[in-house]
Amino acid sequence: MIHHNNYPQLRIELASPEQIRAWAERRLPNGEVVGQVTQASTFHYKTHKPERDGLFCEKIFGPIRSGICSCGNSKSVDEKKEYSNFCKQCGVEFTDSRVRRYRMGYIKLACPVTHVWYLKRLPSYIANILAKPLKELENLVYGDTYPNLFLARPVAKKPNLLRLRGLCNYDNQSWIKILSRFFSTRGFEIFQGREIATGGHAIKKQLASLDLKSVFNSAYLEWKELSEVESTEDEWEDQTIQRRKDFLIRRMKLSKHFLHTNIKPEWMVLDVLPVLPPELRPMIELSEGDVITSDFNELYRKIIYRNNILLDLLLKSAFTPEGLIICQKKLIQEAVDALIDNGIRGQPLRDSNNRPYKSFSEVIEGKEGRFRENLLGKRVDYSGRSVIVVGPSLQLHQCGLPREMAIELFQSFVIRGLIGRHLARNLRDAKNIIRNKEIFIWKILQEVMQGHPVLLNRAPTLHRLGIQAFQPVLIEGRAIRLHPLVCGGFNADFDGDQMAVHVPLSIEAQTEARVLMFSHTNLLSPATGDPIAVPSQDMLLGLYVLTIENSQGIYGNRYYPNERTKDPISSFSRIPYFSNYDDILRAKEQERVDLHSPLWLRWQKDLRIITSLTRELPIEIQYESSGISFQIYENYQIRKGQSEDILSLYILTTAGRILFNQQIEEAIQSTLEASQHRNQQLLAITI
């Protein structure tokens, strides 16, 4: 277990062969060193015990049962004291079985194997540091064109049998046939080690011979020369120069990183392969006799099996054809590639059911990988998740929480309230009351929620407004309701987005939520300072629909000439008249008018609104016998007396606009009252 006080950070880097051995090797009290896995077997088919030196060997990874060795002998294990005693017959330590979760093993490869991440992943680090085409290195690693393609690099201070140097390509293969007949297998291995190299061995030789300082200096000088070259008129040539400069920058960064971290480039070629602990790649036998196993076990078995075959070819067979050895090395390379990143070279390695094996890369990468699923992000208690819908009736700092979700999130608080009020005798009774959904539990839940904020989070949390605090309100249904103005901070909309709910438990967390994280205190963008709680498209469309009027307006009666009355302003008699807001809202409730139908409202607040429209010509002017005139305009009408003084003013509006205006007035009035109250408090404090 990693303790945060001792290990403040975690860094992933290349491991040397010695480091991999140190992870796995252990020295027993009798002096024997264990840790190397040499057999591809797992469990014995009769005894169901792990095979010795296999992938589940108890001697290497620890006992399956705590304090019991492979022979069945037992010894008590004291957790406060480490026991180095072990069984002299089977060599298994008397220790806790939990060591099988972190004890590793290793496989000593019969030939160097190139790490596929550093060869095939883009950018290819091996190709960059060697300054060679990736296709050329692939042909060399996998022996696709051997013996036509190999690396000729004689060993220093030794006589040369062939005067070759560099990457050689021969169409005439007669010489290689003569050499393979002249040398035995061991003799050819000695010759090959001195004169030619293929596969991962060739890559390792080139990486080991690199002088990183010289690589950095030469790349820097070339980049400096290219930077001084002025732009040509040839676009193709300019692009070629730019690509070369980008390559040199990557090469300088890579060599500089190797120098600063004391990592050797040849570590990108594997000589020792680590084996995961058995508990991380389990094998389970079902009651019917079937076995469920991790894909890692099958991939490790293929590597060990092919590695042992190559060892036999090199050690036991005196006249094995050299081409067979090259082919076996290629099989080992492909098996290790499948373990690390299956399918990276095209066709993945498959099992008997034609299903691709799940490699190490698939286990750790992606949203459901080990890092993002288990290490960087974990499921936590007192949290929930649901779809968000709009809640226009909510205040800015409120959110609607479904009853089903709220009773689960605040269950412990409700249980404490039930027991504290003597409505339940113990924990079991309280849970039964909650399970039966008694009516009075909702009242207790509301009291609990009233003083307890919740945190809403929408992934991805790209800035601090991605998680904000709200006052929960109980609602029906199963969706979380959210005020539309806070969607800007979350970058959310109501087309199926989901949000997570978290309950802050400690007093410090609740205080921080109330003081710093409440939505009504986060109205400005932390990046730009611009308002972020602004109406979104949904709100703008809603306001547009609320305040729209029918397309005909005051001219609607022109299409109904038979409905005119004897009113003095008969041309516009179909449009109703109202003296105040209350009459309009009452008519709306009685469905005598709808939201969009035009109506005349007597305006008594400010008659100066017509000053800007004095130049507008009236549509119609009507006179009464008493001398009173009616001047009808497109959006208002004026009633004047004999002395041309304004007796009354009516404006053309709709019920929707009246509702909108009333809400705006109430909001402004409440803001002014709150501001005045706050100023009075500050004044009282200063006095």
Curated annotation (Swiss-Prot):
UniProt keyword terms in alphabetical order: Chloroplast, DNA-directed RNA polymerase, Magnesium, Metal-binding, Nucleotidyltransferase, Plastid, Transcription, Transferase, Zinc
UniProt-listed Enzyme Commission number(s): 2.7.7.6
Domain of life: Eukaryota
Named cofactor requirement(s): Mg(2+); Zn(2+)
Any one GO MF annotation of this record: zinc ion binding
Catalytic activity of the protein: RNA(n) + a ribonucleoside 5'-triphosphate = RNA(n+1) + diphosphate
Cofactor binding note: Binds 1 Mg(2+) ion per subunit.
GO biological process: DNA-templated transcription
Keyword Isomerase: no
Listed InterPro entries: DNA-dir_RpoC_beta_prime, RNA_pol_asu, RNA_pol_N, RNA_pol_Rpb1_1, RNA_pol_Rpb1_3, RNA_pol_Rpb1_3_sf, RNA_pol_Rpb1_clamp_domain, RNApol_RpoC1
SUPFAM superfamilies the record matches: beta and beta-prime subunits of DNA dependent RNA-polymerase
Binding site residues for Mg(2+): D493, D495, D497
Cellular component annotations (GO), alphabetically ordered: chloroplast; DNA-directed RNA polymerase complex; mitochondrion
Location relative to the cell: Plastid, Chloroplast
Main EC class the enzyme belongs to: transferase
Residues reported to bind Zn(2+): C69, C71, C87, C90
Subunit field text: In plastids the minimal PEP RNA polymerase catalytic core is composed of four subunits: alpha, beta, beta', and beta''. When a (nuclear-encoded) sigma factor is associated with the core the holoenzyme is formed, which can initiate transcription.
Function: DNA-dependent RNA polymerase catalyzes the transcription of DNA into RNA using the four ribonucleoside triphosphates as substrates.
Family the UniProt entry places it in: Belongs to the RNA polymerase beta' chain family. RpoC1 subfamily.
Database matches in PANTHER family: DNA-DIRECTED RNA POLYMERASE, DNA-DIRECTED RNA POLYMERASE SUBUNIT BETA
Protein name per its UniProtKB record: DNA-directed RNA polymerase subunit beta'
Origin species: Angiopteris evecta
